[in-house]
Structures are given as structure tokens and as C-alpha cells.
Amino acid sequence: MNLPPRQQSIIEEVRERGYLSIEEMAQMFAVTPQTIRRDINQLAEQGLLRRYHGGAAYDSSIENTAYTMRADQMRDEKQRIAEAVASLVPDNASLFINIGTTTEAIARALLNHRNLKIITNNLHVAATLSAKEDFEVLVAGGTVRSDGGIVGQAAVDFIQQFRVDFALVGISGIDEDGSLLDFDYQEVRVSQAIIDNARQVFLAADSSKFGRNAVVRLGPISLVNRVISDSPPPAAIARLMAQHKVHLDLV
């Protein structure tokens, strides 16, 4: 496919970095934001990248974006979501918190709480929350990934020993049929155990997750009680949420 040089360069930069904002691309190519928006719209229509509010990302169904890039993506939206999730958690509660940069933001937002018991397979979450003397933090055993996530059968077995008040979970994608999707089969198995052993499940998902592809199916959206997001989901997902009485919190 023959593309104009700037559009070809946009694709190469987005693939390398995972995500770029419109402002970054406008500065990079010395053009106006309106010009970049037109380029992004044309490339998205051809399926060459994914358009998001304020930027664009390279979308793969088999490989997630690098951890450091994910941590920078949708940072403001994740912070608002994290604060909203934390506001739903009372003091003296027991929690599961799974792998993800959004759940790490939630951990930081929980630091003003008191007397929480947290079970996690996320080393970054554990490091953040263990700083509070009145928090009890339990960490699953298993294989430690480079992003601080812990996976494997040992992690599943550990999680299954508990029954907690709340599961605070993130996800890589939500398909239009309501499927919750992720990239790592082993991570999904731990997340399934987390959901199965919580009384209430809160899914923190910024708007980039709606319609995003990933290769491993965790289960249907009916598994969760609440979805906390920065934007309403597409109509098909919204209908499924209403059908299964999944509450939507917008921030």
C-alpha cells in the first residue's frame, strides 16, 4: 500500500511507541493538529492504526503494548477512573487487585483508606500499598513477568484460598459481544480466579479498551458488577451491560 510519506512515518512512530498524542505528532511533523487528525482518520479507516480521543495507537490482537508505554497512555483518564474506584471501596475492606497500569493507579488512590486487606498478583501494587502500616498486603506466588505481574498455577491456587469483598480489575479489551479480552493466557487464568472469589467485581476500563482486540477471552461482561470508565461504551456493549444489570460509572 502506497501512503503519503507523513502518514507512513506516523504509522512507523506509533508502532514503535505504542501510542502518540495528536499534539506530539503535530510537533513531530511540524503541521497543525487538524492535519494530524485527518491523517489519523484516513489511517484508521484503512485499519492501519486505532484512533483514540486525543491520539492514536498501534493495535495488535496477539501482543500488548510495552509496559512503559501503557503506563503513559490515557494517564489523566486512568487517574480519574482510579479515584472513582477508590471512592467505592470502604475502609476495613478486603480486596483483590490484578495486573495492569490502571489497577496500579487505583492502588495509589487507595492510600488514604484505612485497614485494608489486599491480595494481589501485581508487584507494583504490592510495593505501593505495603507502605501503609494499617494495610495487610498478600502477594501471590508464581512466575514474575517483566511488568511486575505474577502468573502461573501457583498464583491461581493462592488466589483460590480467599473470598474477598471486592475485586478491582483491569482488562486489555472489551469486544462488542461483551467478551473481556487479554493477551496472556496465564494472566487470564489468575484474573478468572480473582473474579470467581470476590463478592463484587469492579472493572476499571478507559475508553481505549472498548472494541480493542486481544486473543484470550476471560469471560462475558456479565461477570462484573460495575464498569468505571471515562466515556460511554459503544451501543452494543451498553445494551449488554443494561441486559445484565452491570452498572456504569462515568468520570
UniProtKB/Swiss-Prot annotation:
InterPro entries in the cross-refs: Carb_Metab_HTH_regulators, DeoR-like_C, DeoR_HTH, NagB/RpiA_transferase-like, Tscrpt_reg_HTH_DeoR_CS, WH-like_DNA-bd_sf, WH_DNA-bd_sf
Q: Where along the sequence lies the DNA-binding region? A: 20-39
Question: Which molecular function GO terms apply here?
Answer: cis-regulatory region sequence-specific DNA binding; ligand-modulated transcription factor activity
Q: Which UniProt keywords apply?
A: DNA-binding, Glycerol metabolism, Repressor, Transcription, Transcription regulation
Please list the GO biological process terms of this entry.
glycerol metabolic process; negative regulation of carbohydrate metabolic process; regulation of DNA-templated transcription
Q: Check the record and name the SMART domains matching this protein.
A: DeoRC, HTH_DEOR
- In this chain the HTH deoR-type domain maps to 3-58
PANTHER family listed in its UniProt record? GLYCEROL-3-PHOSPHATE REGULON REPRESSOR, HTH-TYPE TRANSCRIPTIONAL REGULATOR SRLR-RELATED
What does the UniProt function comment say about this protein?
A: Repressor of the glycerol-3-phosphate regulon.
Q: What is this protein called?
A: Glycerol-3-phosphate regulon repressor
Q: What organism is recorded for this protein?
A: Pseudomonas aeruginosa (strain ATCC 15692 / DSM 22644 / CIP 104116 / JCM 14847 / LMG 12228 / 1C / PRS 101 / PAO1)
The gene for this chain is glpR
